Amino acid sequence: MYEHPFQLKSLNTFSVNAFAKSVVTAHHEHTLLKFWRKAYRKGKPVLILGGGSNILFLENYSGTILLNRIKGIFITENETAWQLHVGAGEKWDELVVHTIKKNIPGLENLACIPGYVGAAPIQNIGAYGVELSQICEYVDAIDLYSGKKIRFTCSECDFKYRDSIFRNCLEKYAIVSVGLRLCKKWKPILDYHELAHLEKFHITPRQIFNFIYIIRHKKLPDPVLVGNAGSFFKNPIIDIKTARCLFQIYPNMPYFYQKDGRIKLSAGWLIEYCQLKGYIFGEAAIYPKQALVLINSKKIATGTEIAALALYIYNKVADQFNIYLQPEVRLIGNYGEINPKKLFM
């Protein structure tokens, strides 16, 4: 545990050079609650942070950053499933590797996602046809005001596409652990177009993991080398009537049917169609290999530069398609999270 003025460049994968008044590392629930309450009593803002892989600091932060490093991976099993109880401070990708090594399938499609376990329920992480909501049994969180620990069942988490009850209640709850249920009757999920060709093979979880590892490292920049937060925008979901109108104009537009009858579009394709792939805006840019990823390649771009590039993309896509992209990345200002609607209107 430590507390001191801190530069945040190493604590966000965009490598934005912002500062906070203080940073505290919490390895236990009581430490996390103690320092949150200490700042709250002083009227100071507090931001609970995991790996900083889904945030963009627009300016210096005037309060305390609480690094959630509550550890622990506990595995039990019965005849039908493995049940994992995982501390919020475990790295997500290390958890996936841990299960693969123990021959526990179910997380392989979610390989190589940066960040910590505690952040996974907030945005209902997903990749290659699998979302956290499909395997989450519960989320344990502390009500920061009452100090009580609450267990949210999967249904109570109100998971949606890149959204959950926690996304809108970040100032009230601190996630401390997540419960996962992985079925022993394993069936590969190969619906995603880049995995579809694997159906003809007798595929194993480890092989899917290895394949996704290769894909992601080809498509996405390593944040250690190039500042980025992965996909900056969510894939837009539209009604079928709007989709049909768009398909008449853009017959090659990729789309994905949703269970509720709506249509999900590829935000990356929309951006690329606007000829923005590789576009440079000051010290920020759009990644040449994946239009959905904004980069800070020299690690000298400011948060406002990256946000300005995102706004430029937003306006270009809106003008071309009348579709309004929404950021997946959380925007952090001087006193905390900023409602994206204030920037993307």
From Swiss-Prot:
Pfam families: FAD_binding_4, MurB_C. GO terms for biological process: cell division; cell wall organization; peptidoglycan biosynthetic process; regulation of cell shape. It comes from the Bacteria. It catalyses: UDP-N-acetyl-alpha-D-muramate + NADP(+) = UDP-N-acetyl-3-O-(1-carboxyvinyl)-alpha-D-glucosamine + NADPH + H(+). Its cofactor is FAD. One of its GO terms (molecular function) is UDP-N-acetylmuramate dehydrogenase activity. It is an enzyme of class 1 (oxidoreductase). Its EC number is 1.3.1.98. The active site is at R162, S231 (proton donor), E328. Pathway: Cell wall biogenesis; peptidoglycan biosynthesis. It is found in: Cytoplasm. Residues 16-185 form the FAD-binding PCMH-type domain. Its main location: cytoplasm. The keyword Cell cycle applies. Gene3D superfamilies: 3.30.465.10, UDP-N-acetylenolpyruvoylglucosamine reductase, C-terminal domain, Uridine Diphospho-n-acetylenolpyruvylglucosamine Reductase, domain 2. PROSITE patterns: FAD_PCMH. Keywords: Cell cycle, Cell division, Cell shape, Cell wall biogenesis/degradation, Cytoplasm, FAD, Flavoprotein, NADP, Oxidoreductase, Peptidoglycan synthesis. GO terms for cellular component: cytosol. InterPro entries: FAD-bd_PCMH, FAD-bd_PCMH-like_sf, FAD-bd_PCMH_sub1, FAD-bd_PCMH_sub2, MurB, MurB_C, MurB_C_sf, Oxid_FAD_bind_N. Belongs to the MurB family. HAMAP family: MurB. Cell wall formation. This is UDP-N-acetylenolpyruvoylglucosamine reductase. It comes from Blochmanniella pennsylvanica (strain BPEN). The lineage of its organism: Bacteria, Pseudomonadati, Pseudomonadota, Gammaproteobacteria, Enterobacterales.
